[in-house]
């Protein structure tokens, strides 16, 4: 007879319920609620994420199939499709947003991995657009016949988890999200070409942080000093000021412009940074690691349920995205705390077919020989946590 709790119930133990309850109280999330609380809602959504449910109906069918186990799964009472839909439509998404922020902080504390041996953190900031059907998601109008939202993410490269998430309509330009970033003195911030906003970059400079942005090809710098002996692959390395009035007004300080050539295909990359002393090799290494935020977007869109939404209102969509991020951070925490040597992709595949099994988590990952999982795993897919 199996004495171990269900796998999903063991995962729930990694969540800080007291913190969640305090957030719920702050927003009066359970006011006038008799049975199906915000906690029950969170666990239902996470069960759907981990079990790869494609729709609200699909999730409810799965819950009904395990109706006799829900109490021992820690989910509580069963819920109807209409009640879950109502909860996602009406309950304040900020409850889940704030708890996602808490889970991000918890995951980051555990997953410090000094790749660059710097005093400050190293972040990549980028966005991904999630397309929505305009006829269903009328509030998310993007173009004439298209809807969508943007997920702006500040990604902690060394901890390999998001540090900050900001959701906007898809028609908001990437650089408009830059003022929302919680900047830290001494940190490095890496951007792609969509973030050539020199006023915001000057904000980073003023607080004593560093930026590295891939510049547009027409950027003009008046050189004051330049390096004559350049390492292989570095075409140019100069320090100067902007020559264009608008740019110089937004960023009046000196900055550095590097042109680095990719030895494999000859592509030239133009970078701007306020780090005037770092080696060109270090700058190049920083930008190469920016790709990890792209892998995060690819991973979360492929393996967590944010492509197919279980509600049509903006509130419901936000709740689902934040529950996806909470789930992502939970798996990252479990992987760290249990010292698992599997990638998060493998962990999710195993969990997806084992949530209602009764075995200890450590035994599940130690004893399982999921060759079919590895066979299905495409090595070209992002594998963020496979150390």
Language model features by range: what are they?
Residues 1-58, 91, 99-102, 117-121, ...:
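Single, function-defining residue in the core of a domain
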Residues 55-73:
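DNA-recognition alpha helix
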Residues 66, 105-106, 306:
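A short structural micro-motif
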Residues 72, 111-112, 139-142, 178:
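Catalytic micro-motifs at enzyme active sites that drive phosphoryl/nucleotidyl and oxygen chemistry
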Residues 73-93:
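Major-groove recognition helix of helix-turn-helix-like DNA-binding domains
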Residues 82-86, 107-110, 368-374:
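Short alpha-helical linear motifs
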Residues 105-112, 174-175:
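A short, well-structured juxtamembrane/interface segment
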């Amino acid at each position: 007879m199996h004495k171990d709790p269900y796998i999903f119930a063991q995962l729930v133990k990694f969540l800080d319920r007291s913190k969640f309850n305090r957030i719920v109280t702050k927003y009066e999330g359970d006011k006038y609620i008799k049975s199906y609380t915000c906690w029950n809602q969170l666990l239902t959504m996470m069960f759907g994420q981990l079990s790869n449910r494609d729709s609200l109906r699909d999730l409810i069918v799965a819950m009904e199939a395990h109706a006799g186990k829900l109490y021992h799964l820690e989910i509580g009472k069963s819920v109807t499709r209409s009640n879950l839909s109502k909860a996602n439509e009406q309950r304040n998404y900020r409850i889940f947003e704030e708890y996602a922020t808490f889970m991000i902080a918890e995951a980051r504390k555990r997953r410090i991995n000094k790749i660059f041996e710097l005093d400050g953190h190293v972040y990549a900031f980028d966005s991904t657009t999630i397309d929505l059907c305009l006829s269903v998601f009328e509030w998310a109008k993007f173009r004439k016949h298209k809807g969508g939202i943007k997920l702006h993410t500040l990604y902690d490269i060394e901890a390999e988890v998001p540090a900050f998430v900001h959701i906007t309509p898809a028609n908001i330009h990437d650089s408009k999200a830059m003022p929302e970033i919680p900047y830290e003195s001494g940190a490095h911030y890496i951007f792609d070409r969509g973030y050539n906003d020199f006023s915001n970059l000057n904000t980073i400079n003023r607080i004593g942080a560093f930026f590295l942005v891939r510049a547009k090809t027409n950027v003009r710098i008046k050189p004051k000093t330049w390096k004559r002996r350049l390492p292989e692959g570095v075409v140019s390395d100069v320090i100067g000021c902007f020559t264009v009035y608008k740019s110089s007004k937004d960023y009046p300080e000196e900055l550095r412009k590097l042109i680095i050539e990719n030895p494999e295909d000859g592509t030239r990359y133009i970078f701007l940074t306020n780090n005037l002393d770092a080696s060109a090799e270090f700058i190049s290494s920083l930008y190469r690691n920016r790709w990890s935020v792209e892998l995060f977007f690819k991973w979360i869109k492929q393996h967590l349920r944010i492509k197919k939404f279980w509600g049509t209102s903006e509130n419901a969509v936000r709740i689902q995205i934040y529950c996806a991020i909470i789930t992502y951070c939970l798996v990252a925490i479990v992987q760290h705390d249990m010292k698992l040597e599997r990638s998060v992709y493998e962990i999710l595949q195993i969990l997806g077919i084992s949530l209602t099994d009764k075995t200890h988590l450590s035994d599940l990952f130690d004893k399982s020989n999921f060759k079919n999982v590895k066979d299905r795993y495409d090595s070209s897919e992002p594998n963020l946590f496979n150390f």
